[in-house]
Amino acid sequence: MGLRALMLWLLAAAGLVRESLQGEFQRKLYKELLKNYNPLERPVANDSQPLTVYFTLSLMQIMDVDEKNQVLTTNIWLQMYWTDHYLQWNVSEYPGVKNVRFPDGLIWKPDILLYNSADERFDATFHTNVLVNSSGHCQYLPPGIFKSSCYIDVRWFPFDVQKCNLKFGSWTYGGWSLDLQMQEADISGYISNGEWDLVGIPGKRTESFYECCKEPYPDITFTVTMRRRTLYYGLNLLIPCVLISALALLVFLLPADSGEKISLGITVLLSLTVFMLLVAEIMPATSDSVPLIAQYFASTMIIVGLSVVVTVIVLQYHHHDPDGGKMPKWTRVILLNWCAWFLRMKRPGEDKVRPACQHKQRRCSLSSMEMNTVSGQQCSNGNMLYIGFRGLDGVHCTPTTDSGVICGRMTCSPTEEENLLHSGHPSEGDPDLAKILEEVRYIANRFRDQDEEEAICNEWKFAASVVDRLCLMAFSVFTIICTIGILMSAPNFVEAVSKDFA
C-alpha cells in the first residue's frame, strides 16, 4: 500500500510540473511574439506583396425581413483566415503550445465590414479572440446580428422570392495591399424561419475601380435567396378575399323586393377596403410595382363596385313607375327577347294555357246579356227598378288580337264600347239605367287601365330579372378569370401551393 501511494504521488507531481512548465512556455511565447509587434503594421514579409485574406460566412438564422423599411436582419458568423508572418514559432521550443489566442486590438486583423449595413453602430460584430497556430495561420470568427439594407420587390407578394445582398469588403485596404478571396458560405447550422424558406446563399467576388486610385478594391457579395411561405397570407388574406368576392355575386341572387341588395354590396365593398388597409400596412410605400395581392383586391373591388352600380339599375327597372312610359323597343328586343332566350328565361305565366273564347268572332257580344223585367225586386234606394234591354242582340265588338287581357273580360275599344252603351237608348227607358251604365263604363275603363299598368310593371320587373341573371353569369366568369389569371401569374405559384398548402 505504501508503494502504491508513493507512485500515485509521483505521478501527480509530474503532472503539476508539466502544467507549470506549459504555462511558463505560453507566457514566454506571448512575450516573444508581442515583443516587437505593431498591430498597425501589415504582417507580410515584403511590403510590396499583398496579404491574402480568405473570407466566408455561416448563416445561422434569418431573423426578420422588414418589407416596409426594407431591412434584412440575420444572425451570421463571419470567418476570416490569413497568415501573420510575425506570429510564427517552433513547436519544439515551446512544448505543448500548439496555438495561442489574442484579444481584439493586440494584433493586426483585416478591417472587413458590411458595406450595406443598416445598423446604427454600422459594425454589429462581437469582437472575439483571434486564434493563431505555430505556422502563423490566423482564424477570426466574429458573430453578429446584421441589419442590411435590401430592396424588397413586392411585385409577386405573397408568392415572392426575395434576393438580399450582403456586400463585404475592406474599408481602407485596396487590392494591392489586401487580396480578399471568397470561400463558399456555410449553411449547415441554419435554423429555419417560420415565414421564409432559404433557397440558397451564393457568393461572388468583384473588383471595383475608382477615379482616385489605380488599384482595384475587391469585395465579396453573398446573395441571400429566400422564398416566402404563403400559408399564413393565404389563410388570412387570400381565402377571405375569395369568399368575400363570392358573396358579392349573391347580390344578383337576392330578390329586389327584399330591400337589401344595395346594403349587401356596400358591406362587401367595405370589407375589401379593410383588407386593402391591412396589405398597405405591410407593404413599403413604393411606386415601383404593385403587389400581386393588391392587384387581386383592386380587381375584386372593381367587380363589387360594378355590381353595386348594376344593382341600382336593377332596382330602377324593378320599381319603374308605369306612368313613366313603356319600355323602349330596343330594350325590349335586347333584354326580353335576345337575353331572355340566351338565359333560358320565360315570363311568369307564359307557359300557362289560356282558356279559349267560346265566341271568337263575337268576343264582346251582348246578345246573351239580356235583362228581363224584374218584378217585386226592390233596389237599395227603396224604388222598384224595372230594367229591360231591347235590341242588343245584334251588337258586338270587333275581335282584338291583344293577348295581354284574360279571355272572358270585355276587350272592346273605347269607340265600340261607346256605341254599345248608346245602342240600346237607355235614356228612353229609365234615367237610372243611364247612370248605372255610366258607372259600368267607368269600372271597365278602370280595370283596363289597371291591366295596362300591371302589364307594364311586369315587363319592367322581368327586364330587371334578366339583368340580374345576366350579370350573375358575367360577373361569375369575370371573378373566376381574375382569380386564376392574377394569382397564377406568379412564377412560383405552383411551387408555393405544393409546398405550403400540401
UniProtKB/Swiss-Prot annotation:
Activated by a myriad of ligands such as acetylcholine, cytisine, nicotine, choline and epibatidine. Activity is modulated by positive allosteric modulators (PAMs), such as flavonoids, with a wide range of chemical diversity, pharmacological sensitivity and efficacy. AChR activity is inhibited by the antagonists alpha-conotoxons RgIA, ImI and ImII, small disulfide-constrained peptides from cone snails. InterPro entries: Neur_chan_lig-bd (IPR006202), Neur_chan_lig-bd_sf (IPR036734), Neur_channel (IPR006201), Neuro-gated_channel_TM_sf (IPR036719), Neuro_actylchol_rec (IPR038050), Neurotrans-gated_channel_TM (IPR006029), Neurotransmitter_ion_chnl_CS (IPR018000), Nicotinic_acetylcholine_rcpt (IPR002394). PROSITE patterns: NEUROTR_ION_CHANNEL (PS00236). Residues 24-233 are extracellular. Glycans are attached at N46, N90, N133. Keywords: Calcium, Cell membrane, Disulfide bond, Glycoprotein, Ion channel, Ion transport, Ligand-gated ion channel, Membrane, Metal-binding, Postsynaptic cell membrane, Receptor, Signal, Synapse, Transmembrane, Transmembrane helix, Transport. Ca(2+) binds at R42, V44, T172, Y210. Its main location: membrane. Changing L270 to S/T: Suppresses inhibition by the open-channel blocker QX-222. The chain crosses the membrane at residues 234-254, 262-282, 295-315, 470-490. Component of neuronal acetylcholine receptors (nAChRs) that function as pentameric, ligand-gated cation channels with high calcium permeability among other activities. nAChRs are excitatory neurotrasnmitter receptors formed by a collection of nAChR subunits known to mediate synaptic transmission in the nervous system and the neuromuscular junction. Each nAchR subunit confers differential attributes to channel properties, including activation, deactivation and desensitization kinetics, pH sensitivity, cation permeability, and binding to allosteric modulators. Homopentamer. Can also form heteropentamers with CHRNB2, mainly found in basal forebrain cholinergic neurons. This is Neuronal acetylcholine receptor subunit alpha-7. It comes from Gallus gallus.
